[in-house]
Amino acid sequence: FIDMYASNPALRSNIGKALAGRRQQFIIQGHLCATWENDQYLRTRDVEKTIASFEDQLTRLHTDYLDIGMIHYVDSEEDFHEVFNGPIIRLALRLKEEGKIRHIGLSSHNPIVAKLAVESGLIEVLMFSINPCYDLQPPSENVDDLWADESYAHSLENIDPEREKLYELCEQKGIGLDVMKAYGGGDLLSKTNSPFGKAMTPVQCIEYALTRPAVASVMVGCKSCDEMQAAINWCNATKEEKDYTPVMAGMEKFSWQGHCMYCGHCA
């Protein structure tokens, strides 16, 4: 399962080379509305630029379809209504009808907006940022709030109800959740940077994400073979190695008392 939000043409071409002769072995999630301009990534809602970037992606990957066409990065309600009442959603539906994408998805960091997309009945996959720190935070249209130090300065108790409702709604409606930012940009792997004051392991972060309702996969970013192996270790990890609750227990500012964490300890 490969998520390709990045629109860098060199990256697309390199992945295309790696897929040669084994396309059917991979599920490819490509993003609509992510373009490459002036040698850098750009989010767009321009339908012509979106079409051009989509066709470039197919060409460089040497394929004639994407398994998931992910409408890229919709965090505000204004943007949601622009996308779902305009040419972008019509393009996504047309590409699906033509067989160029098999399933329509949407990526977001805001549970309110993500819920609107799920309730629209037009998406089958939701890419959402999930980890034990972000789950404490209330909805926001500003993604920077998720990792701002001041967001964790006060006492926080239990999973934010809007996030919890979103995960349960996805499960009820059969919407697959795939997870981004499972490591919190790497902060959760560092005792110094983690709001918990304790470092989690990649295995614990992945286990946390996979135990949320409706989660089907976790998109882990790796820049080395060692980082790749650290994620793969989840497959053979023991129950004790997967247990993420010790990191969260006994911290003054954080409490999950009387609230389900899906850890399975009560089973």
Residue ranges and their predicted role:
Residues 30-32, 65, 70-73, 130, ...:
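Short, small-residue-rich loop/turn micro-motifs
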Residues 56-80:
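Active-site groove signature of glycoside hydrolases
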Residues 21-51, 72-75:
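Structural motif corresponding to the early beta-alpha repeats
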Residues 1-30, 64, 97:
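N-terminal binding-site loop/beta-alpha segment at the start of enzyme catalytic domains
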